[in-house]
Amino acid sequence: MAARVLASVIVMGSGIIARACTQAYRQALANASKTGVAHEATQTIKRGLTIGEAEARQILGVTEKSSWDEILKKYDTLFERNAQNGSFYLQSKVHRAKECLETAYQKSTTTSA
């Protein structure tokens, strides 16, 4: 009998705690959206996804005076080496570096043309 009462107290208590936690979480989300914390957090995350041109050059091991063909050659070499070893993280870094330099070269060719 005592075990049955103890079990029912534990079940009821855990239900109350679960409801309180979900309600507190909802309230925290509402407060965060009012103050703009959620927007600031997403902006911080978005800023972290892009790399700078200097970092992209460093990843690929090229200089500012390197031709586009040289950049593509370095990209292909590094991408294939990391594909063989199975390093998806390094492959994505190399790919992001190429994308960054590609946009930089496109901007420089459109302004010089």
UniProtKB/Swiss-Prot annotation:
Transmembrane segments: none annotated. Residues 55-104 are annotated as: J-like. Keywords: Membrane, Mitochondrion, Mitochondrion inner membrane, Protein transport, Transit peptide, Translocation, Transport. Disruption phenotype: No visible phenotype and normal sensitivity to pathogens, but higher expression of pathogenesis related genes PR-1 and PR-2 in Atpam16l. The double mutant Atpam16-1 Atpam16l is lethal. Residues 1-48 form a transit peptide. Expressed at low levels in seedlings, rosettes and inflorescence. GO terms for cellular component: mitochondrial inner membrane; TIM23 mitochondrial import inner membrane translocase complex. Its main location: mitochondrion. It is found in: Mitochondrion inner membrane. The keyword ATP-binding does not apply. Induction: Induced by heat and salt stresses. GO terms for biological process: negative regulation of defense response; protein import into mitochondrial matrix. It is a peripheral membrane protein. Gene3D superfamilies: DnaJ domain. The keyword Cytoplasm does not apply. InterPro entries: J_dom_sf, Tim16. Regulates ATP-dependent protein translocation into the mitochondrial matrix. Belongs to the TIM16/PAM16 family. This is Mitochondrial import inner membrane translocase subunit PAM16 like 1.
